[in-house]
């Protein structure tokens, strides 16, 4: 005669907590297993995604109005006329480097308003 799963469940339900603990320990030893919950593989420390705090404003093209682009670059950087002209003509060029996100976005808006193509890195 074979014992069914239902009969085993009923028999376990009638045991005290201490008897269930002893039963589990005996089953672990008999079958060489552990009743502990399976633990996911050791994942390394959670990657911390750091928000970028410093940005470079790169002008890739100056658009159709080079004079306005030169004026905007001079105003933003304090460069002289020749240096600003050389910078604008050598696109793509970093207009400002290592500035805050707010300053970078403001400068980008000014440059895009005059028709320049700008990237933030």
UniProtKB/Swiss-Prot annotation:
The record ties this protein, via PANTHER family, to: 39S RIBOSOMAL PROTEIN L12, LARGE RIBOSOMAL SUBUNIT PROTEIN BL12M
Task: Show the Gene3D superfamilies listed in the entry.
Answer: 3.30.1390.10, Single helix bin
Keywords, ordered alphabetically: Ribonucleoprotein, Ribosomal protein
Does the entry feature the keyword Ribosomal protein, yes or no? Answer: yes
**From which organism does this entry originate?**
Psychromonas ingrahamii (strain DSM 17664 / CCUG 51855 / 37)
The name this protein carries in UniProt is Large ribosomal subunit protein bL12
Q: State the organism's lineage.
A: Bacteria, Pseudomonadati, Pseudomonadota, Gammaproteobacteria, Alteromonadales
What does this chain do?
Answer: Forms part of the ribosomal stalk which helps the ribosome interact with GTP-bound translation factors. Is thus essential for accurate translation.
Q: Which GO terms describe its cellular component?
A: cytosolic large ribosomal subunit
Q: Per its UniProt record, what SUPFAM superfamilies does this chain match?
A: ClpS-like (SSF54736), Ribosomal protein L7/12, oligomerisation (N-terminal) domain (SSF48300)
Task: State the Gene Ontology terms under molecular function.
Answer: mRNA binding; structural constituent of ribosome
On subunit structure and binding partners, the annotation says: Homodimer. Part of the ribosomal stalk of the 50S ribosomal subunit. Forms a multimeric L10(L12)X complex, where L10 forms an elongated spine to which 2 to 4 L12 dimers bind in a sequential fashion. Binds GTP-bound translation factors.
Task: Give the disulfide map.
Answer: none
- What family does the Swiss-Prot or TrEMBL record give for this protein? Belongs to the bacterial ribosomal protein bL12 family.
Its GO biological process terms?
A: translation
Write one Pfam family the protein is assigned to. Ribosomal_L12_N
């Amino acid at each position: 005669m074979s014992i069914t799963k239902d009969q085993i469940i009923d028999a376990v339900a009638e045991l005290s907590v201490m008897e269930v603990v002893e039963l589990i320990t005996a089953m672990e030893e008999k079958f060489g297993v552990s009743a502990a919950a399976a633990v996911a593989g050791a994942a390394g420390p959670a990657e911390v995604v750091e928000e970028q705090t410093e940005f470079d404003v790169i002008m890739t093209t100056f658009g159709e109005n080079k004079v306005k682009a030169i004026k905007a670059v001079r105003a933003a950087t304090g460069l002289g006329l020749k240096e600003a002209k050389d910078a604008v003509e050598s696109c793509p060029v970093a207009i400002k480097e290592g500035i805050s996100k707010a300053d970078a976005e403001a400068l980008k808006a000014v440059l895009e308003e005059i028709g320049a193509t700008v990237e933030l890195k």
